């Protein structure tokens, strides 16, 4: 179903992300004592009673400073208010009312979104009542004392949130979205790509490395199906990142790869494939995720009729972990081929989830054996591949039964995988091949049993 949105609004370091984690029972939002950790608007699933909703966390609002990302953070907050059913405005009860809180109240009055005022860091009921009183002057309604860390008052606050949500019968059914993670090194254009796809300023774009720190979820409809796009923090070598918000953002990025159906690995056309790109490619293959390689900033290169072919060959020679992944040359700046990402990603997901019957698998293996026999030992012992069967999908995984797995070296194993790909496809998806030793008569009996069951 289409879920209503609850926006979290407030100045820096009042505990917005802590409250998001409390409301959503997760630790997805990055919490750190450094102000300005959250920059883009990030979405999580919230639940209370029999209702489901989206909680959108926004960056800390500052109105007396236009340095760095602060104007963009204000724009992100305004976009969140446009789609929200209610805005939860968070203030710091221990610090008391500030001029920044008053500026935020003025900002909210220019939007039509209903508001609920939460006074955070009220660690006891007596404290809460005393602290909340001065916030009536903001004109945002009754102040609700809460403790985001300990959970005090959050149940009552959520009861109030539900009164602003549309009735359940106004929420329609929705298909489970495809999870697509947009990953890459810092500053390769991931956020620009996300904005080009969505047609709006969904993520803050800046030449400063590390602009995106959270993983940013965006829901969108493409190819007649729902997608959830995750723009991740730029992933660098861990020893180059200090312990802090960016460190946690990188960990979130690795988790985004793990929970994705398909990864879009963004490569900078100007830089080519770096050592870190290779590490990311290896991570995607290791986690068994479908993948599309997107070469961004294609508009910035001088080209002739052979440039794309030559560059793809060069890039693939270095991205050997992902030789099965389709490659697309795009420009987030001009929008060139951006929409084609979805068609390739949808095909990769389809192949990633695909299953093939045992009989079809063995037709391919039989042909592979006819072209190239298994290796023979110096003593004259012949390797034998009895049969194969698909045992799993996501990624497609096959068990191959042989007389002795040790006789099948890496070269022949790669040959068999290539033949499976040529015969069965699986473009955009990694494969897993498991080689198992078995006596010939047992293998023949098992294969006959499988075929009789399917017949």
Curated annotation (Swiss-Prot):
GO terms for molecular function: ATP hydrolysis activity; GTP binding; ribosome binding. Keywords: GTP-binding, Nucleotide-binding, Repeat, Ribosome biogenesis. Residues 354-439 form the KH-like domain. GO terms for biological process: ribosome biogenesis. It holds the Pfam family KH_dom-like. It comes from the Bacteria. PROSITE patterns: G_ENGA. GTP 2 binds at residues 184-191, 231-235, 296-299. Residues 4-169, 178-353 form the EngA-type G domain. The keyword Repeat applies. GTP 1 binds at residues 10-17, 57-61, 120-123. Belongs to the TRAFAC class TrmE-Era-EngA-EngB-Septin-like GTPase superfamily. EngA (Der) GTPase family. GTPase that plays an essential role in the late steps of ribosome biogenesis. Associates with the 50S ribosomal subunit. This is GTPase Der.
């Amino acid at each position: 179903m289409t879920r209503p949105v609850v926006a979290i609004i407030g100045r820096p370091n009042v505990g917005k992300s802590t409250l998001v984690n409390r409301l959503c029972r997760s630790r997805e939002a990055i919490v750190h004592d450094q102000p300005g950790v959250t920059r883009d608007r990030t979405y999580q699933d919230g639940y209370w009673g029999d209702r489901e909703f989206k909680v959108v966390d926004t960056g800390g609002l500052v109105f007396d400073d236009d340095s760095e990302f602060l104007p963009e953070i204000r724009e992100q907050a305004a976009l969140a208010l446009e789609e929200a059913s209610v805005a939860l405005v968070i203030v710091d009860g221990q610090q008391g009312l500030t001029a920044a809180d008053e500026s935020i109240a003025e900002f909210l009055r220019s939007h039509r979104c209903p508001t609920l005022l939460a006074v955070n860091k009220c660690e006891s009921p007596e404290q809460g009542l005393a602290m909340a009183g001065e916030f009536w002057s903001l004109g945002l309604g009754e102040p609700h004392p809460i403790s985001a860390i300990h959970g005090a008052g959050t149940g009552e606050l959520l009861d109030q949130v539900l009164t602003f949500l549309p009735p359940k019968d106004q929420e329609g059914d929705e298909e489970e979205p495809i999870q697509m993670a947009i990953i890459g090194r810092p500053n390769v254009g991931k956020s620009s790509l996300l904005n080009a796809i969505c047609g709006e300023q969904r993520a803050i774009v800046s030449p400063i490395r590390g602009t995106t720190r959270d993983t940013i979820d965006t829901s969108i409809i493409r190819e007649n199906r729902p997608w959830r796009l995750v723009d991740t923090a730029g992933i660098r070598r861990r020893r180059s990142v200090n312990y802090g918000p960016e460190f946690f953002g990188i960990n979130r990025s690795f988790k985004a790869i793990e929970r994705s159906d398909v990864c879009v690995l963004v490569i900078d056309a100007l830089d080519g494939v770096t050592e870190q790109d290779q590490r990311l490619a290896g991570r995607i293959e290791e986690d068994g995720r479908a993948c599309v390689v997107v070469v961004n900033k294609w508009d910035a290169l001088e080209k002739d009729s052979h440039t794309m072919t030559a560059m793809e060959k060069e890039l693939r020679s270095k991205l050997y972990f992902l030789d099965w992944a389709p490659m697309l040359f795009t420009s987030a700046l001009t929008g060139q081929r951006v929409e084609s990402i979805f068609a390739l990603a949808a095909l990769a997901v389809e192949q990633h989830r695909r299953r093939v019957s045992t009989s079809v698998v063995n037709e391919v293996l039989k042909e592979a054996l006819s072209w190239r026999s298994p290796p023979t030992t110096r003593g004259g012992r012949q390797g034998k591949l009895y049969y194969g069967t698909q045992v799993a999908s996501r990624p497609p995984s096959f068990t191959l039964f042989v007389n002795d797995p040790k006789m099948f070296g890496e070269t022949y194993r790669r040959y068999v995988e290539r033949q499976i790909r040529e015969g069965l496809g699986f473009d955009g998806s990694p494969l897993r091949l498991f080689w198992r030793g078995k006596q010939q008569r047992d293998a023949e009996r098992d294969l006959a049993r499988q075929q009789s069951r399917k017949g």
